[in-house]
Amino acid sequence: MNDTNGTFYAVGVGPGAPELLTLQAVNLLRQCPVIAAPQTRSGQMLALDIAQGALDLREKEILPLSFTMSREPALREESYQTAARQIEAFLQKGLDVAMVN
């Protein structure tokens, strides 16, 4: 068991061009061993694609997260809680997680 939890970082990828990521965003993505990213039903991970245009993430553990677009609040909350549990599992192992969005 790890006595120290990892840190969660939210990293915005900006308007869509990889060269517009901030230096701080790039540095955080370099330092974190786990990168979480929203994934569409078709499997697309647009925020991750943008980040990968700025730096090589092949050595990172990629955590795809699914969020429902349902109008039903309970279903949305369930998808948020599922994503939180997935991220928390890495944090409890002492691994830092950066979520791109």
Sequence positions of predicted segments:
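Class I S-adenosyl-L-methionine
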Residues: 1-18, 23-25, 30-101
